[in-house]
Amino acid sequence: MLREAWTLAIETLSWMEMRGLSEPLAFAKTVKQLGIDDPDALRFARVLVFETVRRKNFIDAFINEAVRPSRIDHFGLGLQAFLRLFVYSTRFSKDWSKPDLEEAETVV
């Protein structure tokens, strides 16, 4: 379930960046493309995408600071999406000051 949700979220964010699609349209397109039908995976991916997009500017600033002198927009779309989702899941959905290394290993 976790792998499907992350795959769906990464692909959705990539479609949004590449084609400028809205979140609902990109999500629906990705669900159809990947053929994911697990309701838990769909629900979790939807939350990941929505919350990541909502905080995108702050997340990008955080990532840009971490990868300086490079910038997030210098990476491929899939890596950009993964980094944004990873920062959201490790910094926003949990206590900001305590990185969860076990979860990081599970996601990767």
Q: Residue locations for each model-derived region?
A:
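Class I Rossmann-like S-adenosyl-L-methionine
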Residues: 1-108
